[in-house]
Curated annotation (Swiss-Prot):
One of its GO terms (cellular component) is membrane. SUPFAM superfamilies: Flavoproteins. It is an enzyme of class 1 (oxidoreductase). It comes from the Bacteria. Its cofactor is FMN. This is NAD(P)H dehydrogenase (quinone). It comes from Beijerinckia indica subsp. indica (strain ATCC 9039 / DSM 1715 / NCIMB 8712). Its EC number is 1.6.5.2. Substrate binds at residue 98. Belongs to the WrbA family. Binds 1 FMN per monomer.
Length: 199
């Protein structure tokens, strides 16, 4: 049974919701899946003033946790078309793991959220995946076998580079059913690949 880590950062809860869906998909494929988050860097008074969701239940991850998993799926919202400082800071602390080649051969994937459809989803996914590639991980996307990517009946996230959601500029749009299905598919897909690689 592969062990999957879903590692995320979420300001307003959209990525937290996606992370839980990713983990659900991995578990459906027979994997053991843990959900952890990276530390918040924004001072608490500022975070509260901007209505950040600070009551997230997932434990805080450390870089050392990464070696315990066969697959690592990372998620974070966009910040001007790239990963946010919180996730970048976490990966900046993994230099020791990189020196040892500790993550080489593990499966990796990514998911993100943006305010609007054209708010930098794929560039953010690229910036998340770059960390995994530099660590020598085997990167998986969200294949078109997930039929929801071809959904033209609603505004929806989804990219061959990873699962995505659209939050609206004020964060008022909830993660849609189709987007949650995409996240579950990604988790299941990664778990199945990890299972094959570890067979």
């Amino acid at each position: 049974m592969p062990k999957v880590l879903v590692l995320y950062y979420s300001s307003y809860g959209h990525i937290e919701t996606m992370a839980e869906a990713v983990a659900e998909g991995a578990r459906a494929a027979g994997a053991e899946a843990d959900v952890k988050r990276v530390p918040e860097l924004v001072p608490e008074p500022v975070a509260k003033a901007h209505f950040f969701k600070l009551d997230q239940g997932a434990p805080i991850a450390t870089p050392e946790d990464l070696v315990n998993y066969d697959a690592i799926i990372i998620g974070a919202p966009t910040r001007f078309g790239r990963l946010p400082a919180q996730m970048a800071n976490f990966w900046d602390m993994t230099g020791g793991l990189w020196l040892k080649g500790a993550l080489i051969g593990k499966v990796g994937a990514a998911f993100t959220s943006t305010a609007v459809q054209h708010g930098g989803q794929e560039t953010t996914l690229y910036s998340l995946l770059t960390n995994l590639i530099h660590h020598g991980m085997v990167v998986a996307g969200l294949p078109y076998s997930f039929a929801g990517q071809m959904n033209m009946n609603e505004i929806t996230g989804g990219s061959p580079y990873g699962a995505t959601t659209i939050a609206n500029g004020d964060g008022s749009r909830a993660v849609s059913a189709n987007e949650q299905e995409g996240a579950k598919f990604l988790g299941r897909h990664v778990a199945e690949i990890a299972q094959k690689l570890n067979a």
